[in-house]
Amino acid sequence: MSKRILMCPPEHFDIEYEINPWMHVSDPVLPARARAQWQALHDIYTRELGWQVALVPPQPGLPDMVFTANGGLVVGGRLVLPRFRQPERQGETPWFAAWFAQAGYTESLQPRHDFEGEGDALLWNDLLFAGYPWRSDQPAHRELAAWLGVTVVSLQLTDARFYHLDTALTIVDEHTVAVYPPAFTADSLAAIRAHVPQVIEASTADAMAYGLNAMSDGRSIVLSDRATGLIECYRQRGMQVCPTPIDEFQKSGGGVKCLSLELRPPGG
């Protein structure tokens, strides 16, 4: 199944502040390397997998706008805009809102509570797994359920290094997710297992390599080239595995999924 993805070129990507444990202004981005890694991901989507990629223009002064996953959530053609917790990222919202409006997304909601888009909300079949509390508030989950008409399963994250849900959980296919168990409370891990027949447990090494920050269509999966255990696991499952370097973006706490927002059509 071909996906449609929203990305943002990394023209202004850099470490200008520290808002998560990965970010250190003393460890700056190497711009040429970041551009090459972003382009490699873009080319995997478009050339290897045949997915469609739309681009939102990068804006000066918004270095993390490259992480489009936080720019919204699209389910069934309905849009949820982010309400960023960190002041450093709040300026991104009008630019994402303008892009979505121009693209024809006329039904939109911005929650009253903090919510950071697809980074904290992953759709698995007809369930929406939603993370909290580092960047999104649990009360926002009720707003998502009402607006999108889906069942929301709230998952509490426990480790600040895995501050968005998409850093600790991958939607692999309609039967399977991959998780890093130490990133969740016992109750949240039990909730995942109660709903999903197959749960792959990632090692600490693979989780720290941002191997769970991945994109899958059920047959093909794109993930960090340093997550060697998960790469082998997916290959043994018969999937097309597309490893790619993302270490420049991990300096800012981002990876493959952070750089990618899925644009689902009505009914999807």
Q: What do these predicted regions represent?
A:
Residues M1-G268:
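The feature marks the mature, well-folded catalytic cores of soluble enzymes
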